[in-house]
Amino acid sequence: NNVTIIVMITNLLENGRKKCDQYWPHDGREQYKHISVTLRDVDIYANYIVRSFQLRNTKLSKRRSRNNERRILQYHYTQWPDHGTPEYILPLLKFIRISSVVSSPESGPIVV
């Protein structure tokens, strides 16, 4: 589906319990079966983090498919409380605007 943007609004832990699996490497590269995920860049802001990944399908040779690599941007909102909704809406609205304007017409849907 040519997805290039992932929006994450939960943290990995909630009240000390695992809420979401970390599907990206802390640094460097990790292999998940035939998909290689390389963390390229991390930008930390007050209410969110932007991570850039390079995904590579190692099952496909470069000669067989020129589409075996893809750049993914992950927008991770870090201020969602463990219970309820955010107290202040403006940081969340800014996050939604920033994460949605980066999508290009060639991109697939934004995955939330």
Curated annotation (Swiss-Prot):
Annotated GO MF terms: protein tyrosine phosphatase activity
Alphabetized PROSITE patterns for the sequence: TYR_PHOSPHATASE_PTP
Known EC number: 3.1.3.48
A Pfam family that the UniProt record links to this protein: Y_phosphatase
Residue numbers binding substrate: 82
Keywords, ordered alphabetically: Hydrolase, Protein phosphatase
Domain (Tyrosine-protein phosphatase): residue spans on this chain: 1-112
InterPro entries tied to this protein: Prot-tyrosine_phosphatase-like (IPR029021), Protein-Tyr_Phosphatase (IPR050348), PTP_cat (IPR000242)
Domain of life: Eukaryota
Catalytic reactions on record: O-phospho-L-tyrosyl-[protein] + H2O = L-tyrosyl-[protein] + phosphate
Gene3D superfamilies, sorted: Protein tyrosine phosphatase superfamily
Family, similarity comment: Belongs to the protein-tyrosine phosphatase family.
Name the record gives this protein: Tyrosine-protein phosphatase 7
Gene: STY-7
